[in-house]
């Protein structure tokens, strides 16, 4: 099957992503289509700052739509993941069947324990979305290593769930708001759930440690839109726009910054 997709000059990013999502195995298509607004936002975090003619390395993205969406939209994309989550076991052929079809450079390794060796100053963008909260060891060494792969002025984007978002502040006093289910923590080997969710202050700490410039903290509420509760989804639709002005209260938070010049 050809990997050619319509030019972004002729169609929207969302249409490109829809075309890619429909190439996933049938049981995964609905979830990928549902995730298009978030993936399009993540890609535009890059495109609005760097354009589409860039090299991107995504850490821990699994079989999701982001890295292949970057490639389908004209970026040169690499994906680093151990593909050891349950969904990756069930659909082990996805990286070869979908991602490599769009020339994504798939690097299969534990990103923390055995990080890849990209040449210094060889990448324009390094990203990680909803991944570092799962890592069992400190992300510091890997993030500094990833920073060395970036050219001066290159872009760093880290997206995580906010451990103190508004919903958790309101529900925890009522005994609701555990990070992981008991079955995920107690029954799974190895445990792949959330080890530590950051907050805005944590992202700012990381930005200082990495000596990033042009730092932005951005808030969104994707988790609310995807919540199993219809009430939470309804409240999210009402509160999303005003909450974006207060990232400390948002469900999803992003660190965006650039590598300092040598």
Short names for language-model regions:
Residues 6-37, 41, 61, 82, ...:
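S-adenosyl-L-methionine-dependent methyltransferase catalytic module, highlighting the catalytic core
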Residues 43-51:
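Glycine-rich helix-loop-beta junction characteristic of Rossmann-like nucleotide cofactor-binding loops
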Residues 53-62:
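Conserved class I S-adenosyl-L-methionine
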Residues 55, 76, 122-124:
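Structural signature of beta-strand start/N-cap positions in the alpha/beta core
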Residues 63-75:
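Conserved SAM-binding loop of SAM-dependent methyltransferases across substrates and taxa
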Residues 76-82:
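Conserved SAM-binding motif I beta-strand of class I
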Residues 116-126:
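A short acidic, Gly/Pro-enriched loop at the edge of an enzyme's catalytic core
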């Amino acid at each position: 099957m050809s990997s050619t997709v319509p030019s972004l000059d002729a169609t929207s990013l969302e249409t490109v992503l829809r075309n890619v999502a429909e190439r996933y195995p049938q049981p995964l298509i609905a979830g990928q289509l549902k995730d298009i607004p978030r993936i399009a936002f993540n890609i535009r975090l890059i495109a609005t700052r760097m354009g589409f003619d860039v090299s991107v390395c995504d850490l821990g993205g699994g079989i999701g739509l982001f890295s292949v969406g970057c490639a389908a939209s004209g970026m040169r994309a690499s994906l680093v993941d151990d593909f050891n989550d349950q969904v990756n076991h069930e659909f082990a052929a996805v990286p070869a069947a979908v991602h490599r079809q769009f020339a994504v450079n798939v690097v299969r390794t534990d990103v923390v324990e055995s990080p890849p060796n990209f040449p210094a100053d060889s990448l324009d963008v390094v990203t990680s979305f909803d991944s570092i909260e799962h890592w069992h060891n400190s992300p510091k060494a890997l993030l500094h290593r990833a920073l060395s792969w970036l050219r001066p002025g290159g872009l760093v984007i880290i997206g995580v769930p906010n451990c103190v978002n508004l919903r958790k502040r309101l529900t925890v006093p009522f005994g609701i708001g555990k990070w992981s289910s008991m079955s995920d923590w107690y029954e799974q080997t190895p445990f792949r759930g959330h080890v530590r969710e950051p907050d805005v202050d944590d992202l700012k700490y990381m930005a200082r440690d990495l000596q990033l410039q042009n730092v932005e903290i951005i808030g969104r509420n994707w988790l609310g839109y995807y919540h199993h509760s219809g009430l939470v989804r309804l409240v999210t639709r009402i509160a999303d726009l005003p909450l974006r002005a207060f990232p400390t209260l948002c469900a999803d938070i992003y660190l965006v910054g650039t590598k300092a010049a040598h």
